[in-house]
């Protein structure tokens, strides 16, 4: 397909609608999806079909014929493509040559067909027999003098069964080194919520959206990241719910939505207004904004109490279910409005407006994405939002609750079944008892710690169950240095990506079945299970013929790695690879909530795993929900850098384009933001562009400001005048990941602060002609 001409052109249509249908058709053609595989779309997110390999948004219990979205089609088309990367492809391309290609070009080559090993003499990947590949892995692992010298990464696309077997193998091997994609996204949620409500998961289901009268949407862009959420928001808006979007960018999907599932809306050119109100904090201003809302709620309650009016606070809930409220209220009363306004970037009148909306709501849901979780203070921010919801009893009742919207399709499920570098003692005891071994007790490495350990020479083997580790991570040049220092890198994957080219001394690419493909073991079709963002667990069966006869399932690959490394004295690995129900039996024995796992999966749509805080059961030291007190931070890296550089210091947030999913680049457009045929763009306020002495359309280089003496720069970005708060910038990752310092992480969660990068701009040394 011809590369489009780069251009900037405002998009005037609603999200989805005919534009989405056009792009669906173009993607199916671009991926050369065969006629038979087109039918796969009608099995997407259906009870007897497969779970979308894209986002973690839940499926409706009563599914329609079309339970897919534009980005889901992109994911399925990419997996169902007829294009193949065979051994012959690598005969024609060295690794050095492939490194010169863009991430988009690498994605477009198609599905991998055979296991491959790196041949250093020829700088090529060459075929290897499966048995030899597993023997190489077992040899490397068994030669290490300490199991903690290996790290085992997991992508959120791995199924519950694959993830559970993986963690069992790794813990029997002897380490808790489980860097996971969740370390880079919603870790602040997983670490923050247990401190307040006891469980690091959301408390709502889709049913609650049917009863909510107020929705607060923090730091997310559903039209791109989880488009099916727009269907729920549309229904909420149609019945009169108040929807408030709290985001630095005024995203198109938060403005208007034309539903492809509603013919009248499509045929008449109509659309539905989604947001009633927009609140635009500066990047990183959410904590101060939420604190301002909570302070106003206290003021409203104080006034009501003084005048003998009904209380604004849910006094009964606070008294029965919480501790710590008095200290929290005292802190709010003492907080300065000047500090709240300055640090949030939101005028006081808008903070009061948001507080009034919240106080009037009888059933409030708060949702959030990575706009809340990739800052230095994200754990306190999540906990403060939890505090706000507890003030009016908006947790554990119909139509109300906490709704973190996670990214990849099974990122939550992987954590549930044991992909956790900091496992609880109770989990390890149950795992050891069921499988008759002593699991390692010492906490392992997360993503950033794994990279630091590689750079320090402590990690020598890296195995990745899916993902694109070398591109998804921060501080790109240092990550590449770290990966190249390994003795062995292994990637279990469906398609070629950059991480396969950033390899260790020995390197393997192990191709696996995709979610859309039939998984036959001993003549029996196997299903795998996943857990969505609202704790619903359901079965997924592939429908397409495998892309190659030489593919193995993720579970088979994990089982055979384990067999080659550990033998079968404790676990019959191959039996588990032949019958996934055996793995689910193990999950049932080890993890509470999975009772009668195999039977419950037979119910159309699966089952709800159960979240204690949804039932107002608080798994905290006090046995109650806990109000926690946090102050506004005035000494962050952004503050310190601005003290030195003044108003020239900008705060950069990384974001996705509409044509990508995580690090997978499906195309070069971001049409809702008016960007076409290019990715190296930098969104900036027109007044900032002028203040800095630039012009829109000019190329600039971006340098991050950090205190470790390392120069971090990303060159030749096109300045685009955009509706974004002063002092704030936006650009796509992974192009801007080199700007994120490895040591810049969320306190208490270790997440790279990819939404809070202090940067300076200068005119680009690369001409516009060269950049194009």
Regions found by a protein language model. Name each.
Residues 77-124:
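Low-complexity, highly charged intrinsically disordered N-terminal segments
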Residues 1-49:
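Intrinsically disordered, low-structural-confidence terminal and linker regions
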Residues 49-55:
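Short cysteine-rich clusters marking metal-coordination/redox-active sites
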Residues 67-78:
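Short cysteine/histidine-rich metal-coordination sites, predominantly Zn2+-binding motifs
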Residues 576-671:
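Long, low-complexity segments enriched in small/aliphatic residues
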Residues 61-62:
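Short, non-ligating residues that shape and space the ligands of small metal-coordination modules
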Residues 125-214:
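Long, structured ligand/cofactor-binding scaffold of large enzymes
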Residues 116, 187-387, 391-397, 405-588, ...:
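Non-catalytic alpha/beta scaffold blocks inside enzyme catalytic domains
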